A protein has these predicted regions:
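Conserved beta-strand in the GNAT
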Residues: 45, 51-62, 77, 82
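Conserved active-site alpha-helix within GNAT-family acetyltransferase domains
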Residues: 94, 118-138
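A short, internal acetyl-CoA/4′-phosphopantetheine-binding micro-motif in the GNAT/acyltransferase core
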Residues: 80-88, 117-118
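A conserved beta-turn-beta hairpin within the catalytic core of GNAT-like acetyltransferases
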Residues: 61-78, 88, 110, 143
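Conserved GNAT acetyl-CoA-binding A-motif
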Residues: 104-118
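A short beta-loop-alpha structural element at the N-terminal edge
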Residues: 3-16
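Active-site rim helix/loop that mediates acceptor-substrate recognition in acyltransferases
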Residues: 24-49, 65
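Conserved acetyl-CoA-binding loop-helix of GNAT-fold acetyltransferases
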Residues: 83, 89-102, 127, 131
Length: 151
């Protein structure tokens, strides 16, 4: 089964909303059920056999305001990434990140950051991001970590 990672297009919103509802119900669905999202967002999907099995949302015009930014803005910011639990450990999350990094490079964004979600599974998420080339840059508090990567 091949997985295609691409920019989200009209018609993907309901599939994104379903994925969020099933895999990350604490996330805000925003306008996805109505197939709407802000133009400034980079919205990527992983599609397998006609189903959305992965989703990444980020921005390429952000500004990291902490002390760890090594270059001036714009900075990329990965806001969220979700992969269908049954499809995990097959490279889909990594492929979504690589597609985002390609878009960041094309937009002349040199540095991308993210904040791994805390709580249950946080250590696994941090390991995944390290495996994807991100490194810890700053600790916001005892539970939140900033991770970043050069494009």
């Amino acid at each position: 089964m091949d997985t295609v990672v691409r920019e989200a297009v009209p018609g993907d919103g309901p599939g994104i909303a379903t994925l969020i509802t099933e895999e990350a119900p604490h996330f805000d669905l925003q306008g996805y059920p109505e197939d709407l999202w802000p133009d400034h967002l980079v919205v990527l999907v992983a599609e397998r056999e006609g189903h959305i099995v992965g989703w990444l949302e980020g921005i390429l015009d952000g500004e990291y305001e902490g002390s760890g930014a090594p270059v001036p803005p714009p900075h990329g910011y990965i806001l969220a990434i979700v992969v269908d639990e049954e499809q995990r450990h097959h490279g889909i999350g990594g492929d979504l990140i690589e597609k985002f990094m390609e878009e960041a490079l094309a937009a002349k964004v040199e540095w991308v950051f993210l904040i791994p979600e805390g709580g249950e599974g946080c250590e696994d998420r941090v390991r995944f991001f390290i495996h994807s080339g991100f490194t810890p840059t700053e600790v916001l508090d005892e539970k939140r970590l900033i991770m970043a990567r050069w494009t």
